[in-house]
UniProtKB/Swiss-Prot annotation:
Part of the FGAM synthase complex composed of 1 PurL, 1 PurQ and 2 PurS subunits. GO terms for molecular function: ATP binding; glutaminase activity; phosphoribosylformylglycinamidine synthase activity. Part of the phosphoribosylformylglycinamidine synthase complex involved in the purines biosynthetic pathway. Catalyzes the ATP-dependent conversion of formylglycinamide ribonucleotide (FGAR) and glutamine to yield formylglycinamidine ribonucleotide (FGAM) and glutamate. The FGAM synthase complex is composed of three subunits. PurQ produces an ammonia molecule by converting glutamine to glutamate. PurL transfers the ammonia molecule to FGAR to form FGAM in an ATP-dependent manner. The keyword Nucleotide-binding applies. The keyword Ligase applies. It catalyses: N(2)-formyl-N(1)-(5-phospho-beta-D-ribosyl)glycinamide + L-glutamine + ATP + H2O = 2-formamido-N(1)-(5-O-phospho-beta-D-ribosyl)acetamidine + L-glutamate + ADP + phosphate + H(+); L-glutamine + H2O = L-glutamate + NH4(+). This is Phosphoribosylformylglycinamidine synthase subunit PurQ. Its EC number is 6.3.5.3, 3.5.1.2. Keywords: ATP-binding, Cytoplasm, Glutamine amidotransferase, Hydrolase, Ligase, Nucleotide-binding, Purine biosynthesis.
Length: 223
């Protein structure tokens, strides 16, 4: 069975539900403390939370821990790396994804459900979706305003949209450039996203739209 590491930093708080989402997707997952090794895992998820209490900047301290070098090595081998919310912030701070996550346009914490348009289905995390499919997931962040000088340096995977898939200013909750909610590296094996797919992975949570993210990466490794 394919096995994923769910990395836990001081302040991580979405690790248990991320493990459960991977299990529901048919994979095996283990919580791995950030001081331990992840070299024997098939892929890595950096879940949400407030690593190191967002001191300095969200993700800034976690991105400078030794485990990030192992994550970089796994990424270079082509293994899937997923960063969710704080995990996305950590990936940008570590230079594994271009761009930066800035404070929301309206400087406050946002916790709400949003609609997303699936733009790129050529990644391990999104190939089970249809291009242009509209999905529903929650966000919970204060620094989710994604900025990048040159959007051609990344693959835009998810965009904030209305329920019909229109990319509008009104549908953009945090001011992200081009309504970007998630991006991948050019190779497609590293994905960072601010919405929480693990919180949309079971019908009793209100949506199962996020489960395909985990099913995709599990089946991609298995194949």
């Amino acid at each position: 069975m394919v096995k994923f590491a769910v990395v836990v930093f001081p302040g991580t708080n979405c690790d248990f539900e991320t493990v459960e989402a991977i299990k529901r997707a048919g994979g095996k997952a283990e919580r791995v403390w950030y001081k331990d090794s992840i070299k024997d895992y098939d892929g890595v998820v950096i879940p949400g939370g407030f690593s190191y209490a967002d001191y300095l900047r969200a993700g800034a301290i976690a991105a400078r821990q030794r485990i990030m070098e192992e994550i970089r090595e796994l990424a270079e081998e082509g293994r899937p790396i997923l960063g969710i919310c704080n995990g996305f912030q950590i990936l940008t701070e570590a230079g594994l994804l271009p761009g930066a996550l800035r404070p929301n346009k309206i400087p406050r914490f946002l916790c709400k459900w949003v609609h997303l348009k699936v733009v790129d289905v050529r990644t391990p995390f999104t190939y089970l979706y249809e291009e242009g499919e509209v999905v529903r997931m929650p966000i919970a962040h204060a620094e989710g305003n994604y900025y990048i000088d040159d959007p051609s340096k990344v693959r835009i995977v998810f965009q904030y949209s209305d329920e019909k898939g229109s990319i509008t200013e009104e549908a953009n909750p945090n001011g992200s450039v081009l309504n970007i909610a998630g991006v991948a590296n050019m190779e497609g094996n590293i994905l960072g996203m601010m919405p929480h797919p693990e919180r949309a992975s079971h019908y009793f949570l209100g949506s199962e739209d996020g489960l395909k993210v985990f099913k995709g990466m599990v089946e991609w490794v298995r194949s």
